[in-house]
């Protein structure tokens, strides 16, 4: 399986969730199963079945996070040369050529992308068009509404 880029912040967030699932949620669920089991007949014990379902979900999420972390290529933006090029992890401000409106995005891994926080995946159409370009370059992005042209007006390497 190939490696997937991830920022240091993204990896730390996944590690924190994994730690919580293993050392907080897992013991709590095991205790809930034991308590429900003590109530008697397991066939009609909704509390027991709910706890087992929760355990199954928790263990599945643990496996998912471990797989993501094992296949992550963690990229520390602070260790990369700041040469004004748009790269994974950089924060880019672009200007819509036709309207003059400005947008700022941070290019992150797929698991970290959140458009509400202006974080876009490196595999998104906008990020693919921006990566490798430099300050003042014009880029054309294919959108559902057609081709849109942007100008790169700022490239920052911000470590959160």
Curated annotation (Swiss-Prot):
Keyword check for 4Fe-4S: no
Superkingdom to which the source organism belongs: Bacteria
InterPro entries: GreA/GreB_C_sf (IPR036953), TF_GreA/GreB_CS (IPR018151), Tscrpt_elong_fac_GreA (IPR006359), Tscrpt_elong_fac_GreA/B (IPR028624), Tscrpt_elong_fac_GreA/B_C (IPR001437), Tscrpt_elong_fac_GreA/B_fam (IPR023459), Tscrpt_elong_fac_GreA/B_N (IPR022691), Tscrpt_elong_fac_GreA/B_N_sf (IPR036805)
Coiled coil: 50-70
Pfam families: GreA_GreB (PF01272), GreA_GreB_N (PF03449)
A GO BP annotation: regulation of DNA-templated transcription elongation
Keywords attached to this entry: Coiled coil, DNA-binding, Transcription, Transcription regulation
MF annotations from Gene Ontology: DNA binding; RNA polymerase binding
Signal peptide range in chain numbering: none
Family: Belongs to the GreA/GreB family.
Function text: Necessary for efficient RNA polymerase transcription elongation past template-encoded arresting sites. The arresting sites in DNA have the property of trapping a certain fraction of elongating RNA polymerases that pass through, resulting in locked ternary complexes. Cleavage of the nascent transcript by cleavage factors such as GreA or GreB allows the resumption of elongation from the new 3'terminus. GreA releases sequences of 2 to 3 nucleotides.
Listed name of the protein: Transcription elongation factor GreA
């Amino acid at each position: 399986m190939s490696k997937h880029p991830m920022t240091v912040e993204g990896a730390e967030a996944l590690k924190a969730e994994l730690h919580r699932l293993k050392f907080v949620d897992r013991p709590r669920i095991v205790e809930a199963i034991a308590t429900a089991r003590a109530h008697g007949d397991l066939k009609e014990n909704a509390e027991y079945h709910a706890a087992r379902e929760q355990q199954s979900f928790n263990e599945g999420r643990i496996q998912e996070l471990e797989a993501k972390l094992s296949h992550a290529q963690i990229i520390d933006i602070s260790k990369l040369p700041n040469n004004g090029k748009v790269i994974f992890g950089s924060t880019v401000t672009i200007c819509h050529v036709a309207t003059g409106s400005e947008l700022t995005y941070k290019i992150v891994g797929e698991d970290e992308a959140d458009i509400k926080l202006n974080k876009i995946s490196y595999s998104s159409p906008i990020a693919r068009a921006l990566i490798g370009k430099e300050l003042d370059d014009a880029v054309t992005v294919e959108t559902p509404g057609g081709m849109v042209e942007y100008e790169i007006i700022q490239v920052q390497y911000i470590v959160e």
